[in-house]
Structures are given as C-alpha cells and as structure tokens.
Amino acid sequence: MKFPIKTIRRGGQITAFPKNSLEVSKLVKFSNKYKFHILPIGGETNRVDGTKPQFEKTILIDFKKMNRIEEVDTDNFIITAQSGTLLKTIQKAANNKKLLFPVNIAPSDKCTIGGNISTNVGGLQTLRYGNIEDHINGLEVVLSDGTILNFLNKLKKDNFGPKLWKLFCGSELSLIHI
C-alpha cells in the first residue's frame, strides 16, 4: 500500500503531515479506500484524549505543517491562513499591518486557527467582538469523501444566499477538515 504523502507509522496508526488541502484530500480518499479512521490534530490544546486513537487502523492528520499565512490583504482587512497556523502568528501578522484580529485565548502560542474554527472559540473579548465565526469571511474545506470546497471570499459585504461555510464553524471537525 503506497501512501500519498510523508508519514510516520506506529503499528496500525499512521501520522501524516499534509502541507496543503490537496494532500488532505488525498489522505481522506486513501483512508476511505483502505478503511482507516481519521483523527485530525491541531495544537492539541483541548486535550481530553481527543488525540488518542481509539481504533487500530487510524490516520492521525497533523496540521502543523499547514502553518502558512498566504496573504494579508489590508485593503479588504482579510488574512488568508492555513489551518495549522498558530493564533499568535495570525495576531502578529494583523498587528504588523496595523490591523486587529480580536480573538484572544490563553494558549495563543499553541492553538491553531483550524482548531479555533472547529470549536468556534470565543475568548477573552467575546462579548465585545463575538466568536471566531464572526471574523471569518470564508473557508476552504475538505469533505469526508475528499472533495475540496472553496468558500474563500474577499467581499466584505456579500448578500449572496446563506453562508454554507458557517455550518463548519463549531462542528468540531465532524463534517470536514478545515
């Protein structure tokens, strides 16, 4: 069985380190074909045995290498970042451009934006600024069949129908991989 990207194997468990959505898609398709369970790993700050595999044939998808800020658009006040990017890195990128990313939780140097989105984190200033979903303009997601959906949008004001990507905020990755 040839694996689609670089991995570490331990018994029946495989840890994979994708670098982009296409590699996540390949992992999901691979896991479907060979009947592996998937366990996504972000910053591991919400440790309640969530990253402990419960099944023998498990692929742990570690998002640590998906840690790039792809763009800081100061005209539209939008930061595009991969899911493994640390919250602190996003806050620094915003501050460097004289912008504010108001989501602020204690382990900002360890938690990832993908994990924050999957739990719809609020943080210390939630009453003033809202939860993280209030600061997201779009997402690129990988569905459970490996399909990549791109909901990225640079329009600040968008009245085009319901925001389907909002379904994924707070889903705890039960629906997709961010």
Give short role names for the model-derived ranges.
Residues 1-3, 141:
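Charged, low-complexity, helix-prone segments enriched in Lys/Glu/Asp/Gln
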Residues 42-46, 86, 177-178:
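Ser/Thr-glycine-rich phosphate-binding loops at phosphate-binding pockets of nucleotides
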Residues 68-72, 78-176:
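FAD-binding subdomain of flavoenzyme oxidoreductases
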Residues 3-66, 81, 101-103:
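Glycine-rich N-terminal segment of FAD-binding domains in flavoprotein oxidoreductases
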